[in-house]
Regions:
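Hydrophobic/aromatic-enriched cytosolic interaction surfaces used to assemble or bind macromolecules
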Residues: 1-174
């Protein structure tokens, strides 16, 4: 994914946030070298819990409705917007912690991965709050897809597969 950055990300500090269900992991890389690694307890399941509480769904119903984009009309204003703000602030705090605990004072790119990374407005809000160019990681970028692959679904879910693709690629990269 870093290879898709300008100049293939050479000499760039890349902050990779993998937003999981319960944990968000920050990894800062430069030229494929891991410089920093920290986890924080904040993830996509908090959004599902908010949906569940607000609308009276079970957790499982809330998750299914979230994935199917089958939520009440006020969802974006009442739940999604404030959640995107909170998640963006958590990302900003994690970066500030990185800056205060290392000699670095900036990153060149913020890359978002994990199922929650595709939330509408998240990339833009992170850029706005941090001042750093943000993007959603897509491990399938530039890859030729077979005819049986449902491209729209794959593109939508691509950030969720970043770790799996990285692990699979390790076998082929010397």
């Amino acid at each position: 994914v870093v290879a898709a950055l300008p100049n293939e990300g050479k000499d760039a500090l890349v902050a990779l946030f993998e937003i999981g269900a319960d944990t968000t992991s920050l990894k800062v890389l430069r030229d494929e070298e891991l410089l920093y690694d920290r986890d924080q307890a904040f993830g996509g399941s908090q959004l599902t819990q908010l949906i569940s509480r607000q609308y009276g769904f079970s957790f499982e119903e809330a998750e299914a409705k979230k994935l199917a984009n089958d939520l009440p009309d006020d969802y974006e204003q009442v739940i999604l917007g404030p959640f995107v703000d909170s998640l963006s602030q958590e990302i900003g705090r994690a970066l500030q912690y990185f800056f205060t605990s290392t000699p670095h004072h900036k990153v060149h790119y913020v890359m978002l991965a994990g199922g929650t990374a595709s939330l509408p407005g998240l990339k833009e809000r992170v850029t706005e709050l941090t001042g750093f160019a943000s993007m959603v990681g897509n491990p399938f970028e530039g890859m030729k897809l077979g005819g049986a692959v449902r491209e729209s679904k794959l593109r939508r879910e691509a950030p969720s597969y970043l770790t799996a693709c990285g692990l699979a690629m390790r076998r082929f990269v010397a």
